[in-house]
Swiss-Prot record:
Compositionally biased region (Basic residues): 814-825
Keyword NADP: no
Protein name: Ribosome quality control complex subunit NEMF homolog
MF annotations from Gene Ontology: ribosomal large subunit binding; tRNA binding
GO CC annotation terms, alphabetical: cytoplasmic side of mitochondrial outer membrane; nucleus; RQC complex
Tissue and organ distribution: Expressed in enterocytes (at protein level).
Membrane topology: Peripheral membrane protein
Keyword vocabulary terms for this entry: Coiled coil, Cytoplasm, Membrane, Mitochondrion, Mitochondrion outer membrane, Nucleus
A biological process from GO: ribosome-associated ubiquitin-dependent protein catabolic process
Induction: Up-regulated in response to DNA-damage induced by ionizing radiation.
Length: 992
């Protein structure tokens, strides 16, 4: 099977890529450490083309969507830095070698990407002087040639084009060839066209098996021994072609060879024109079928830009361009592997069935043969009754005379020497078993030809204790016993064969089903995240780590979407996609909150905490002046809507992909139910109580002490919130839900998290404030707010306008509180809260930019605020990969969600099954489900047990069982939060 480009492929590929000259690099991605994608865009053109290069293997344009790494590699970042928005100026082959040079930009701003397509391959990024800026595989060749950064790329190392072979050069080449060399071996290193072209032109002119034969015979043994050094494969090839070798005639064959060389050069010129079609050479593989009909599967083996004559008897697929053929060849490699694996499994299953049939047939044949032999022996004893009786009596007489066994042997030999007929019929004495072997023939089988040939003799064992008739009867009994055994064997064989055939057909069915499911299985974009579909048909996604948290907020969160987060550090960022723009029902909010809590450190800690939701416009990556938001960190502005506490209960279930014609039967399975909304709304919106109903004694639970250890300055109100996502570390500050609400209201006024985690210069400080979501007394809160606000205002020497700030902040002086309260009343409509918070963080006296006014006034409702004070010189470690050119789904694709059901009906056409981990309340109506709670069990073991439970369900149909078999345990376990306890009805019977 062809795996990489040859010289002629490179010639045609470079010529075809000339159409991309002048296009700009839009973006660069890496598929793996050897394969890179260049997203190209023409000037003023809407169309985009993706150029794929793979070190040591290939380069071509592609229309397929290749998987890209979540974060770009270091090499990709280097390529982006130097090549992004650069114009592709030149694509050329270096000399006649398998090296391609892509030039981006011109003059001193030019950069080269050099792709090596031989040996282990390489990709080198150089500047305009070909000085290496970055190299994929640094190495050395010999003592002087070094491939590394800041080394100049050796252009002279590339193989230079050979001169056109004239008649004299061709004759000299043939004269210098060794005796026994094939013409293709001589021409390949001397023509810049590759072995496929040379084989084509030689076959076209009838010179494919011509070898050089010289008159001297001294070198013949050496020539014959030479292929032995090439290994087993070369020796086998030599043996196969040895009989077809033809000597090359320098007189008659030389003009033909010269014409063949010209044809090869014409093919190269045709390839340089860039008008090559593409061909994929295929092999027809016969597929075994259940009903005996013949089916075929076409396996791709090679790709070429020209239909060579050596492939005229092969199946082929034709394409308009060579790039299309290469793209199709490599893009279908995975499905071809699946088909070949399926074919191999089918063949193995049928081979086992064939072996069973052959074994049974062999056993029946042996039983039939035994019957024939026993019957024949019985007939021979009957036909030679007197002879058999005489032999038995003679031996019995010798035994009765008390002769020793050696004496009896000597007696028989003497009788045979004397020509005794009875003694001559004795073949062997088996006195240890009381038997003798007689040589018997049919006395009635006397034809005219008997005088010319000896009669057929059969050796028959005779029991000395029985007469001739009794021995004959014994053989007849043995024959009947064998016949009965044969009958039983036939009956058993039929049952065994039916069972084997049934198992084989079942195996074939399973193999084909799994193969079809794997090929039909569409991996949806949201499966790379934590995800589930809510009870009301909203798609909910969450990030697995900081990079994915960044990704879903930047790429997938749209206006009207809801951002959900747990009131705990290290939780996943959860997005509820809202394509309709309508208000998200409370039940979906609760389920998303449960997901956010479960995918956090709360799961392993087995603690219950709160979650909250905000709208998408409240989430921002805009950091305070002078600060940096690390990957996965966001600023949340305004009020947070807290959700009721929920249990750490998740569920594992299956969603089935429906065929389009069956989707309508399942519409409305996940719809909004108003009664449930009415029941849940009071709990969900308990934070939205009007402020005039709050008492004066409400606890200022959101107060934060941001002063130095020696300062008593307090800051109140509702500061902007930055959620720092760290899955590995983090301090958990939660409120216990087991406390009596009345007692808790009293305690919560005292449990105000006003401590600050001390921050060093090289350590990021995170402040997570977890507060209650219940009603508080207003007076206490207002008192504290006024006091804290007064102290903040006292830190200024003069009353600032909205866009100004104090130059010399100081502590509040005695006697200024009354004046500051008047100032506060005067400037109460100004939203300077964010400016004050930033000033306190930065300890800066510089001026800030004006803040937004009326649209960003923060309500004084209960909410918990978080603030992360990152490192002074923080920098992103792993930038998140954002594909700006990719089409981003706007909200959940409703059609896709409607095509997935957890409640398959009888008669539905199910295409494949997708495992889903979701809050258990979202799975109440699903057919297959198990409950997951924090425990000590491993995720893989729990997933395996869940599959076993689903497969053994009485209501599980045959198709559903087939789909279950195609699900891998790792895909089932990857979304389980952590150590887990699995719960299901009658769980004990599934444990082995």
């Amino acid at each position: 099977m062809k795996t990489r480009f040859n010289t002629f492929d490179i010639i045609c590929g470079v010529a075809e890529l000339q159409k991309l000259v002048g296009w700009r690099v839009n973006q660069i991605y890496d598929v793996d450490n050897k394969t890179y994608l260049f997203r190209m865009q023409g000037t003023g053109a809407v169309e985009k083309v993706t150029l794929l290069i793979e070190s040591g293997t290939r380069f071509h344009t592609t229309r397929f969507e290749w998987p890209k790494n979540m974060a770009p590699s270091g090499f990709s970042m280097k390529l982006r830095k130097h090549l992004k928005n650069k114009r592709l100026e030149k694509v050329q082959q270096m000399g006649s070698d398998r090296i391609v040079d892509f030039q981006f930009g011109t003059g001193d701003a030019a950069y080269h990407v050099i792709l090596e397509l031989y040996d282990r391959g390489n990709v080198i990024l150089t500047d305009y002087e070909l000085t290496t800026l970055y190299i994929l595989r640094p190495h050395t060749e010999g003592e002087n040639l070094r491939f590394a950064m800041r080394e100049k790329y050796p252009v002279e190392r590339a193989k230079q084009p050979t001169k056109e072979l004239e008649l004299e050069a061709l004759v000299k080449l043939l004269e210098n060839a060794r005796n026994g060399d094939y013409l293709r071996q001589i021409l390949t290193p001397n023509l810049d066209c590759g072995p496929a072209v040379i084989e084509h032109v030689l076959l076209s002119h009838g010179l494919d098996n011509h070898v050089i034969k010289k008159e001297t015979t001294e070198e013949t043994p050496e020539a014959e021994d030479k292929p032995e050094k090439g290994g087993k494969k070369q020796r086998k090839k030599q043996q196969n072609t040895k009989l077809e070798q033809k000597p090359f005639d320098m007189v008659n064959d030389l003009p033909i060879l010269q014409q063949a060389v010209k044809d090869a050069q014409e093919l190269i010129a045709e390839g340089n024109s860039g008008k090559s079609k593409g061909y994929i050479i295929q092999v027809k593989e016969e597929k075994p079928t259940e009903n005996g009909t013949v089916e075929f599967f076409f396996r791709n083996i090679e790709f070429h830009p020209y239909l060579f004559i050596q492939f005229k008897n092969f199946e082929k697929a034709t394409f308009e361009s060579f790039m299309e053929a290469v793209d199709e060849f490599y893009s279908t490699q995975e499905s071809q592997k699946i088909d070949m694996k399926t074919l191999q499994q089918e063949r193995e299953a049928l081979k086992k069935l064939s072996n069973v049939k052959n074994d049974h047939a062999k056993r029946l044949e042996e039983l039939t043969k035994v019957q024939d032999v026993d019957r024949k022996k019985a007939e021979l004893i009957t036909s030679n009754q007197s002879l058999v009786d005489n032999a038995i009596r003679a031996v019995q007489s010798a035994i009765a005379s008390q002769l020793s066994w050696p004496d009896i042997h000597e007696l028989v030999k003497e009788a045979q020497a004397n020509g005794d007929a009875v003694a001559s019929s004795i073949k062997q004495l088996k006195l240890e078993t009381n038997h003798i072997s007689l040589m018997l023939s049919d006395p009635y089988d006397n034809d005219e030809d008997d005088d010319l040939k000896d009669p057929e003799v059969t050796v028959v064992d005779v029991d000395l204790a029985l007469s001739a008739w009794a021995n004959a009867r014994r053989y007849y009994d043995m024959k009947r016993s064998a016949a009965q055994k044969e009958k039983k064997t036939v009956d058993a064989s039929q049952k065994a064969l039916k069972s084997a055939e049934r198992k084989t057909q079942q195996t074939l069915k399973e193999v084909r089903t799994i193969s079809n499911i794997v090929k039909a299985r569409k991996v949806f974009w949201f499966e790379k995240f934590y995800w589930f579909i809510s009870s009301e048909n909203y798609l909910v996604i969450g990030g697995r780590d900081a990079q994915q948290n960044e990704l879903i907020v930047k790429r997938y969160m749209r206006p009207k979407d809801i951002y959900v987060h747990a009131e705990i550090q290290g939780a996943s960022s959860v997005i509820i996609q809202n394509p309709t723009g309508e208000e998200i029902p409370p039940k979906t909010l609760l389920e998303a909150g449960s997901m956010a809590i479960s995918y956090s450190v709360a799961w392993d800690a087995k603690v219950v905490t709160n979650s909250y939701w905000v709208t998408s416009d409240q989430v921002s990556k805009t950091a305070p002046t002078g600060e940096y938001l690390a990957t996965g960190s966001f600023m949340i502005r305004g009020k947070k809507n807290f959700l009721p506490s929920c249990h750490l209960t998740m569920g594992l279930s299956l969603l089935f992909k429906l065929e389009d014609s069956f989707i309508e039967r399942h519409l409305g399975e996940r719809k909004v139910r108003s009664l449930e909304d009415d029941q849940i709304d009071p709990n969900v919106k308990e934070n939205e109580v009007e402020h005039d109903l709050l008492s004066d004694n409400e606890d200022a639970d959101s107060n934060i002490n941001l002063s130095e250890p020696s300062s008593n300055t307090e800051i109140t109100a509702f500061p902007n919130t930055e959620v720092k996502i760290e899955h590995d570390t983090g301090r958990i500050i939660v409120r216990s839900d087991s406390v009596n609400p009345e007692i808790e209201e009293t305690k919560e006024s005292e449990v105000v998290l006003d401590k600050i985690l001390k921050k060093t210069d090289d350590e990021e400080t995170t402040i997570i404030l977890a507060g209650p979501s219940r009603k508080k007394q207003v007076s206490a809160k207002k008192t504290k707010e006024d006091k804290a606000r007064a102290k903040q205002e006292a830190a200024k020497q003069e009353v600032p306008p909205v866009s100004s700030e104090p130059k010399n902040p100081s502590q509040v002086k005695r006697g200024q509180k009354g004046k500051l309260k008047k100032m506060k009343q005067k400037y109460k409509d100004q939203d300077d809260e964010e400016r004050e918070i930033r000033m306190m963080i930065l300890k800066s006296s510089g001026k800030e930019k004006p803040q937004a006014s009326a649209d960003k006034v923060v309500e004084k409702s209960e909410s918990t605020k978080e603030y992360v004070k990152p490192e002074k010189s923080a920098a992103p470690k792993n930038p998140v990969e954002l594909d700006d050119a990719d089409e981003v789904p706007v909200g959940g694709d409703v059609d896709v969600l409607n095509s997935l059901t957890g409640q398959p009906h009888e008669g539905d056409e199910l295409l494949f099954a997708i495992p889903v981990v979701a809050p258990y309340q979202a799975l109440q109506n699903y057919k297959f489900k198990v409950k997951l709670t924090p425990g000590t069990g491993k995720r893989g073991k729990a997933a395996k047990l869940a599959l076993n439970i689903f497969a053994k369900e009485k209501s599980c149909s045959a198709r559903e069982k087939d789909l279950l078999k195609s699900i891998k345990e790792e895909s089932l376990a990857r979304n389980i939060p952590g150590k887990v306890k699995l719960s299901a009805p009658q769980l004990q019977k599934y444990h082995k």
